Amino acid sequence: MANVWGVRLADSLSSPTLESRNRSYTLHDFCSDLDASAGKEPWKALRNQRTSEIVAVRLFRPLQGLILDTHMYGFPGEFDAWEVFVKEKLRVLKYEVLRVYPISGYSNSHVNVFVANALVGAFLSNQAFYDLLPLLIINDTMINDLLGAGVSLAQFFQAHGDVLEVAAGRKYIQMNGYSNDDDDPPLFAKDLSDYAKAFYCESFEVLDRFFWTHDASAGVLVHYDKPTNGNHYLLGTLTQMVSAPPFIINATDAMMLESCVEQFAANAAARPAQPATRLDQCYHLRWGAQYVGEDSLTYRLGVLSLLATNGYQLARPIPKQLTNRWLSSFVSQIMSEGANETPLWPQERYVQIAYDSPSVVDGAVQYGYVRKNQLRLGMRISPIQSLSDVPAPVAWLPQYTIDQTALEDGDMVGHMSQLPLRPEYGSMWVGEALSYYVDYNQSHRVVAAKELPQLPDTYFDGDEQYGRSLFSLARRIGDRSLIKDTAVLKHAYQAIDPSTGREYLRAGQSVAYFGASAGHSGADQPLVIEPWLQGKISGVPSPASIRQFGYDVAKGAIVDLARPFPSGDYQFVYSDVDQVVDGHDDLSISSNLVESILSSCMQATSPGGSFVAKINFPTRSIWYYIEQKILPNITSYMIIKPFVTNNVEVFFVAFGVHRQSSLTWTSGVYFFLVDHFYRYETLSAISRQLPSYGYVDDGSSVTGLEVISIENPGFSTMTQASRVAISALCANTGNSRKTISIYESHGARVLMLVSRRSPASAKRKARLRYLPLIDPRSLEVQSRTIMPSTPVLFENSNGASPHVCLTMMYNYEVSSAVYDGDVVLDLGTGPEAKILELIPPTSPATCVDIRPTAQPTGCWNVRTTFLQLDYLSDGWITGVRGDIVTCMLSLGAAAAGKSMTFDAAFQQFVRVIAQSAANVVLVQVNCPTDVIRSVRGYLEIDQTSKRYRFPKFGRDEPYSDMESLERICRATWPNCSITWVPLSYDLRWTRLALLEAATLNSASIRIAELMYKYMPVMRVDIHGLPMNKSGNFVVGQNCSLTIPGFNAQDTFNCYYNSALAFSTEDVNAAMIPSVTATFDNAKNEWTLDMVFSDAGIYTMQAVVGVNASPIALGSFVVDSPDVDITDAWPAQLDFTIAGTDVDITVNPYYRLMAFVKIDGQWQIANPDKFQFFASATGTLTMNVKLDIADKYLLYYIRDVQSREVGFYIQHPLQLLNTITLPTNEDLFLSAPDMREWAVKESGNTICILNSQGFIPPQDWDVLTDTISWSPSLPTYVVPPGDYTLTPL
């Protein structure tokens, strides 16, 4: 693909090859044109492409004789009026013509086009025209008739011996709306009077002799192919100018430009069987070339005309309707820097045609053309395919050549950078609340308030306030109170009273809302109230009423909630009071306010009721107050963090208020708060590193945008600076997404590239010694317009997908494991080599992948090697260094590709690594670390074939189990320590993501956290110190670790997520139910006996010596208890309101609730229908009240104590679908869902449930408390019968 200065040409040739025959212009044709009948008018309306207003008219014969000033014609300025005016004038002129030349005698007589144009022009300007009528019909030839005329026609024609001078009439006229707007059509100076003169003669030789003695400095133009109306030269005027911003061009250039564009359009449209009016539309320069330089527009248009005649095509299609904007851009490209990269150069006296040009104009039969046998273009013949414009920037993947330059050269082209600029900020986080919670669990260790973590001392420092503010501004969400309230209610309504088996919070309760505000957009009350009352919050039944209290209420009572007030009693009090309103940032004042609010909540809650209180600043003093004043007077509690914005605010939920108990804080609360504060500190630190909201990006921030703009880009050796600039952007931004736009801007065609710099890309750039240069080919071939958009820092409005979030989690683990100078061997690197952005720039790296790398080579400052091979093959690793081996998201695919089991692939992986000098292996494995459950839509697990299926990608991989993988490791490395790297819920992994300007999505994070359980990271310290496990590492059971090789003075720490679970330095402070540590001097080993109350991954660390050096000992997994569950139904079912008791056998660790699946969505079943309680023998009993509708619904028992409801247990209650209903006693009947249902008794329809205006049969009664799955659907008591239900 060649460039001619800034004009990009296509890589194929095309020309019209079939020419239509000329047809003589007869008097019949002339009169038909004067009729101007609809659809056959001798003009064409031209519109502004933005407004669609008609702003100009293109004129055809016989209207091309308008040579006087516009005011001489008296034309109306609006097209509709102009058209009426002209049609009336032409109609009158036709009758004048027919009066002299009756159609009956002159119908086929040939008309002199020169005279026809002049006649119409004179008539429309009210000039004398009768002298022209005798010349209308051709006697000899058009030219000779006028040369021999004895009348004075100097206004239109002049004779110069054998040469006839004809004034060029307008080809366009402007309407009032024409303003030379960017979207107006270009008129090429042909709307001006006297823009050119035409000189006609029977032979070109006579014309040449004429111009020997006349001034040709303006440039003499010629149509060699089928010159209109005869051989002629065209002399444009230098005084008539037309604007093509930023250029002003004269009439000669304007005419060349128009003809050149027309020929390029004809080339693109050419087809073998499609005739063209003219094979070569171009004007060529016949005289005057000596007056133009190679940098002039005239000369360059001459080159383009030559190329168009030879069949070259523009790489970028010409729009069907030209605009001034497009033309300005085209002229700007013509005049930009560069060179003519084609072998064609214009000659003054003839047009050279290449030997292999598809054009059939030829000097053998046509004057002015010479085919050059020695001139060959070597291009294929094919019309260019027109591509549609693209409305938004398109992603671009850079590719590299072996060329390099100095890194400093990239800084030298800074003039192409668009920095500083003010980008849009976008959203760093989208989606609903990411909720975390903990509730009271009596199996947990008792913890005092003083042992709970304290609010960070720096919380009110200025930089932390800035971080919170930035996160809040860049967090895209609707009404934040609504989102938080909804999340809190969903969790609170799931809590179950173990003494009754029913939820604490149920439908129809009275509710008080403390802190209600009328300041919500579009409502004069908190936005949660209306959907709550209407039962539209999934899993949250509607209350009987909600009364509002607070400073800013509109539908309630104004009151100071921190002081006693006559509120009345409510079964549920929801307090959304902010301590910052009265307490600001004074912790003592705000803590006292919390205590007052908690007291008000207690006073307003009826016995056995519940309340929620928001705590903005959870300090130990508040926990101590709750411990002393609240916990003894409630039966259970829950702490919820609906993570919407980054702060330490939590919601405390109290259940069973005013009932005595011995509740305490627990280790679960301790772990929850540790994660909570770590999560806040992590995101606060990240936010403080991000640029400020609304910032001006000058390139100094670690995270930001890189934008370069290249006008009229070419990629020849003449525009090396452009290539260096693009390469510098790629070096600055690494693997960040890059987008390109190619568009018109102020007369220039612009290439804009946008990407993002980050600490990760800075690491990669710091590794470079030289600047690798990109291959511009993929940019060169772009001929489309790709529209730009305003650069956005966080651009993904939907947020990262679950798979991207999962990858970010792995990236964090890799970056955390590698230290300065570590030699890294990365397996399954991928073409993008992300590893180079994760490890220190001082760390040598060997990257191995079966696919070729897309990274440059030979440009690195530190040894960086790329090997293309199968890393599961033998022999290749000899001599390859690697202190730490990393392998992420690769081994499963490699096993699938080789049709191996995961065990076999992992064994070969270990065998290969064992031949190296590696100390650490960090590998992502396909291995469940928890109860096997599919992740809907993302991960399907086939336990029979031991395969993972990824439906989003249409692939599957094998998986293994933890024991097998550990056994394979220890068989090769007996003394290794193995760590199953836990996923921390403090979100520390988001640092890399957010600093790379990746938008996170709450739902995606939840899914990625689930997937991580089945695709964990395994760390093997090959030369570590192993732990020996004994006993059952199951929640609530005794287990022990034996750790040899340490001294009695050494200490062992155990971590659960981010929190310290216990330390042997003080086992009494342990956060697990039981731990004892003993040292055997004889065996020189430690034994740790433990009981755990939380399932998950625990990591062990030894602290040795006077320097307290940490040594990783590996990890172990504490499993949840057995998930087996059975339901034993009695032989005789009870269809009365007493219900049927069903014995449930399940481990008491699990808390259960009944759910129903409606339209594929889980709904909590009505607690009045299903009740769980402990029987006298200590077993679990489920009481269910039976309904005819049960046969038509899918009920399940699901566990509710995990972060994911139903993660461990989803047990179908299949008997409900198969029960035989009695026909001799009253039964209960509800609608199975909200649709209309036909109720049939013995096959006869007796009524339609849920129908409009439904009235139950007279022998039906309504049950006071519904036992339908939904509390909003009534239950009827129906007489004995044989009932069936049919949906309508």
Curated annotation (Swiss-Prot):
One of its GO terms (molecular function) is GTP binding. InterPro entries: Ig-like_fold, Reovirus_L2, Reovirus_L2_4th, Reovirus_L2_6th, Reovirus_L2_7th, Reovirus_L2_8th, Reovirus_L2_GTase, Reovirus_L2_MT1. ATP binds at G892, A893, A894, A895, A896, G897, K898, S899. GO terms for cellular component: viral outer capsid. The keyword Lipid metabolism does not apply. The keyword Transmembrane helix does not apply. The record marks K190 as: Involved in formation of the phosphoamide bond. Its main location: virion. It catalyses: a 5'-end diphospho-ribonucleoside in mRNA + GTP + H(+) = a 5'-end (5'-triphosphoguanosine)-ribonucleoside in mRNA + diphosphate; a 5'-end (5'-triphosphoguanosine)-ribonucleoside in mRNA + S-adenosyl-L-methionine = a 5'-end (N(7)-methyl 5'-triphosphoguanosine)-ribonucleoside in mRNA + S-adenosyl-L-homocysteine. It is found in: Virion. Its EC number is 2.7.7.50, 2.1.1.56. Keywords: ATP-binding, Capsid protein, GTP-binding, Methyltransferase, mRNA capping, mRNA processing, Multifunctional enzyme, Nucleotide-binding, Nucleotidyltransferase, Outer capsid protein, S-adenosyl-L-methionine, Transferase, Virion. It comes from the Viruses. Outer capsid protein involved in mRNA capping. Catalyzes the last 3 enzymatic activities for formation of the 5' cap structure on the viral plus-strand transcripts, namely the RNA guanylyltransferase, RNA-7N- and RNA-2'O-methyltransferase activities. Belongs to the orthoreovirus lambda-2 protein family. Interacts with protein mu-NS; in viral inclusions. This is Outer capsid protein lambda-2. It comes from Reovirus type 2 (strain D5/Jones). The lineage of its organism: Viruses, Riboviria, Orthornavirae, Duplornaviricota, Resentoviricetes.
